[in-house]
C-alpha cells in the first residue's frame, strides 16, 4: 500500500485539529507545539523539497530534542514517504544511548495512517553516528544535485576543498579538545580558511555507509558534513537551526564550486 496522501498546505486549522483529535491527549499536546521536533521536521522537509534536496522520497532528517526534558530523544522521519507531505505523527522516536525505539507511526490510529506499514529510515544508523560521535542536535541528509556533481567532478579525490569564499564564514570552526576528548566549536570559519569536507564511497544500501561515515567523522574533526559520492551529503549541527544554516551554506558552496570548475577557476586560492 502506498503512503497516505497528505496534500501540502491543504489542511486548514480546523482540519488539522480534527486529525489530531484521534490521537491520545499526550500526543495532541505534543503536536500542538509548532516548535516540537516532529513539527519542525515537517516544516524543514517541505523547505528542502522546494530546494530539490529530498525529492522522490529521498533524503531524510532527524532532530534530537536538545531543548526538551529528555535530550536523548531523537525524532526521525520514516523511509519511503514523500517528504513534502509528511506529518508529525509519522516520526519514529528513538532514545539514546541504547537506541531504543519508543514509538513508531505504526502505533498511531489507522484513521491517520490508512494502515500504511511504515519502515524506519535507512539513514537511522548514520544519524545515530552523528549524535554519538559529535553530540549533534540535528542531522540532515539530502540528495542535492550540487553535492552529487562535486563528487563526480572530483572522482579520484577523497576530499572537497574550497577557500576564499565569503559564505564559508557561515560554518563553524571546530577543534578536538584532547583534555575532554570532544570536538568543540571555537568560533566561525574565516574568509581565508579552507573548508574541507571528506568524500566517502557510496554503497548499495544506505546503512552500509555507517562504518565509512564514522571513520570520516573521526578523521576530520573540523568537518560538519560528509559527502557521499554519486549520492548526496550528510550535514549536522549543534541545533536544528544550526544544521539548517550549515546545510544551506555548504550547498551554496557546492553549487558555486561546480560553476567555478566549469569556468576553469581554482577552488582554492593560493596566498
Swiss-Prot record:
Binds 1 zinc ion per subunit. Transmembrane segments: none annotated. The gene is MDE1. SMART domains: Aldolase_II (SM01007). Its cofactor is Zn(2+). It catalyses: 5-(methylsulfanyl)-D-ribulose 1-phosphate = 5-methylsulfanyl-2,3-dioxopentyl phosphate + H2O. It is found in: Cytoplasm. GO terms for cellular component: cytoplasm. Zn(2+) binds at residues 141, 143, 231. Belongs to the aldolase class II family. MtnB subfamily. Keywords: Amino-acid biosynthesis, Cytoplasm, Lyase, Metal-binding, Methionine biosynthesis, Zinc. The active site is at residue 166. Pathway: Amino-acid biosynthesis; L-methionine biosynthesis via salvage pathway; L-methionine from S-methyl-5-thio-alpha-D-ribose 1-phosphate: step 2/6. The keyword Metal-binding applies. Gene3D superfamilies: Class II aldolase/adducin N-terminal domain. InterPro entries: Aldolase_II/adducin_N (IPR001303), Aldolase_II/adducin_N_sf (IPR036409), MethylthioRu-1-P_deHdtase_MtnB (IPR017714), Salvage_MtnB_euk (IPR027514). It holds the Pfam family Aldolase_II. It is an enzyme of class 4 (lyase). PANTHER family: METHYLTHIORIBULOSE-1-PHOSPHATE DEHYDRATASE. It comes from Candida dubliniensis (strain CD36 / ATCC MYA-646 / CBS 7987 / NCPF 3949 / NRRL Y-17841) (Yeast). This is Methylthioribulose-1-phosphate dehydratase.
